[in-house]
């Protein structure tokens, strides 16, 4: 969770017109939870700005220590790390990048840690037996960003939360000395869910892949290693929340929402050639109308599969009730929720998505 000004009510002046407590600004919120399998979770550090910075420092320390422990025991391991890397509130006096924006400066610290991981793998003597993947987050939040932060659109349109390519397409690299040839540039489609299936295959753990649900990931081992030179995936369905927003097939894309004039007639203009129009600003009705039937068939097959294997329901309940070290203000969140539920004229559960 990224820290924004509203999450720190103590930084704001007293508002004499506030009628509710806590009102819109959260109180007692939990920033980070840590835990182990089979155990209850606990809050890490707290919710201060100092704790926000400490998340990455502690995560990096634990990542290196975990690698060292398993290398010493000659055991295979899997590590996933999603750094905070950008502090919205921390003053930044020194500009470490030529760009000078808050995001480019934050990349410098992240880049240093990536180098530390690669160096440690070599020091431990396991680089040739380890697949290392680094990839970006989808985003950034390009709509009305703070000035000077470099949260700007580049080649693709959109940002975090969008179904346009700027909100879903990210750069990535895979490094495996002796197994993946250097200096390759691959333009194939790989979905993040493919990493699950691919890692299971490379790690000899396919027998642990669940058989009681649909696994979206496609095995991309042959793309990474010598052999088949192309991805086993040429399509992707893109959602906004629980709404199917777009479908990509190869270089072509169909928008299902925001389809513009003519949509109600069944002839939508929202077909795009991503090679020619990466910003998805010039829909091509006439040149691409022959794709209409095929895209509609893809959507119907997808919807039919979801009827057989529906999405899991969202979790409901009192938040943070199981934390072993919950603060009084955190526990108050659950108590307040119960009071508000009891005061409602009817059950709110049936209105929850």
Task: For the regions a language model picked out, list residue spans one by one.
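Loop/turn elements at helix/coil->beta-strand transitions in domains of secreted/extracellular proteins
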Residues: 1, 72-79, 126-132, 168-170, ...
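Formylglycine-dependent
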Residues: 1-75, 83-92, 266-269
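C-terminal cap/loop subdomain of S1 sulfatases and analogous C-terminal strand-loop tails that border
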Residues: 5-11, 140-163, 180-184, 188, ...
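Short, solvent-exposed turn/loop segments enriched in Gly/Ser/Thr/Pro and often Arg
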Residues: 7-8, 79-88, 134-142, 217, ...
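Short glycine/proline-rich turn/loop motifs
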Residues: 36-48, 93-98, 175-179, 278-281
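Non-transmembrane alpha-helical segments in soluble domains
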Residues: 64-68, 111, 118, 122, ...
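Histidine-centered active-site microenvironments of extracellular/periplasmic hydrolases
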Residues: 89-106, 112, 119-179, 191
